[in-house]
Amino acid sequence: ELQSETKKMKTEKPKKLIRWCILGAVGCGFMAAGDWLLGCIPLRETDTGLFNRAYYLSGSYGLWKPVLTVGLGAVGGFLYYFVVKALNADIDTKYRKTKIIQYLCGIFTVAVALTIHTWVATMAWFTTYLGPRIGEEAAIAAVTAYQDGMLLAIAPMYVPMILAFGIHFVMLLAGKTRYSRWMLAFHPVTWNLLLVTVPDIAQAMQVPVATWMSVMSQSSTNSAIMVWCIAAAVYERSHTQ
C-alpha cells in the first residue's frame, strides 16, 4: 500500500505539469495569434519598427485586427499563469529563495502581458486610422510621440519578464531543474533569440524583405514560450509512461 501511494505521488506531479504546460501553450497560442495578426502584412524595404509600415499608413490594414489582438491577449494573458506555475515547479525545491523570486517575476509578467500587448496593438490601430486622415508624416510623428511617452512605463515591465525566464534558463543550465540540460534547445530564451536573429541574418544576407520576417520577429517571445510548453509536456509524458 505504501509503495502504491508513493507511486501515485510520483505520477501526480507530472500530470499536473503536463496540464499546466498544455494550458500555457494554449495561452501562448492566443498571444502569438495576436502577434501574427499585427505582423502578417505586405512589407516594404522602407518599413521600420512596430508601426512605421506602409501598409498601416495607407489605411489598408483592417482596424478590427488590433481589437481582436487585444481580445486574444486577454485570454492568453490569463493562461500565462500556468506557464509561470510550470516553470516554477521545474526548479529544485532546495532553492527556495530563487523559486520565490522567479515566481514573483512570473506573476508580474502575467499582470503586465496584456498591457504590453495592447500598447503594440494600439500603435498599429492609430497608424492605420491616422495615416489616410492627417498624412503619413503627421501620423508617424503622432504615434512616435505616443510610443516614446508610454515607453517610460513599458520598458521597466520587461525587467521582471527577463528575470522570470532568465532565472529558469540559468537553473536549467546548472542542472537545478527536473529536466536534462538538452532541454535548453527548447527553452524560451533560446528560441526567442533564434526567432529574433533569423530575420536579421536574412536581411544581412540581402534576402528580400518578406512577411515571414515580420511575423517571426513580432511573435518571437510568445512563440518561443509555446515551443517550451509543448516540449516540456512531451518530456513529462514520455517520462511517466
Where are these predicted regions, by residue range?
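Short, Lys/Arg-enriched N-terminal segments with co-localized hydrophobic residues
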Residues: 1-8
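Hydrophobic, aromatic-enriched alpha-helical segments typical of multi-pass transmembrane helices
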Residues: 10-240
